[in-house]
Amino acid sequence: MEQMTLRGTLKGHNGWVTQIATTPQNPDLILSASRDKTLIQWQLTRDDQTNYGFPKKCLTGHNHFVSDVVLSSDGQFALSCSWDKTLRLWDLNQGITTKQFVGHTKDVLSVAFSADNRQIVSGSRDNTIKLWNTLGQCKYTIQDESHSEWVSCVRFSPNTQNPIIVSCGWDKMVKVWNLTNCKLKTNHFGHTGYLNAVTVSPDGSLCASGGKDGNAMLWDLNEGKHLYTLDGGNVINALCFSPNRYWLCAATGPMIKIWDLEMKSVVDELKPGVIGISTKSRAADCISLAWSADGQTLFAGYTDNLIRVWQVTRSSQ
């Protein structure tokens, strides 16, 4: 039996940790985004529980909450978005912004890179989805048939044979877009509350969505249909598929739920102990999740400004 064990924490942000990005190019580096308006490049040392790594570089420039961050496939560049209405492209070696993307009229909530890193998609509280090139030029704004409320999350499919974008929003909808013509391919109905997260499986065949209603809904991207629903039991703030196991992870309130998708059963439920004796102290919520490229380590960002690091271990049963 496989389970998850808490290995350590990363302390450095002064605000909620809104997103975490990892890269196969450098397993000792992760990047995190925060409501403290910064991004931190972490050097992982894996020393012990209290010192799993240290902040190597702090990237500053956004003047409001940083809501999302992604790494380029070579691990050299990062792309972030913020409630300051902009996106930024960062050269990580130099720790500087090389390009600012201006065009959204309200907070930008989500950003993603296409598989070849040539296209960028962003979603905003202005209810639009924008496609950009790496030079910071907006090539297309999806408005026809777009979300009628905030666009909370946008993701590209990693499958280059089926070039699509998946988005979700506060209108309870999951939408699948044809990347070739930016036209709507499928509307997925079923959620009963606003959506926070959508994620595409590593092979591009499935996507999962979640939000206020606490359900993780799985959709077949090839057939364009609903497959099944998993009960998260609390508001879902983040979702991610394991890169090498048939697992889906959901950040649901203070917990992280991990499902085996073949069995549709819970592999593990991760909850950090509440520190503090006061009965009022509520456990922090988990709001971001990222797997290491090898699928052995799960990084989780919380509203107590910490990143907690969990590792896959084998139990003796």
Curated annotation (Swiss-Prot):
WD repeat start and end residues: 3-45, 52-93, 94-135, 137-180, 181-221, 222-262, 263-313
Gene3D superfamilies documented for this protein: YVTN repeat-like/Quinoprotein amine dehydrogenase (2.130.10.10)
Keyword Repeat: yes
Keywords: Repeat, Ribonucleoprotein, Ribosomal protein, WD repeat
Keyword Ribonucleoprotein: yes
CDD domains linked to this entry: WD40
InterPro entries tied to this protein: G-protein_beta_WD-40_rep, RACK1-like, WD40/YVTN_repeat-like_dom_sf, WD40_repeat_CS, WD40_repeat_dom_sf, WD40_rpt
Domain of life: Eukaryota
Record's protein name: Small ribosomal subunit protein RACK1
Organism field: Hydra vulgaris (Hydra)
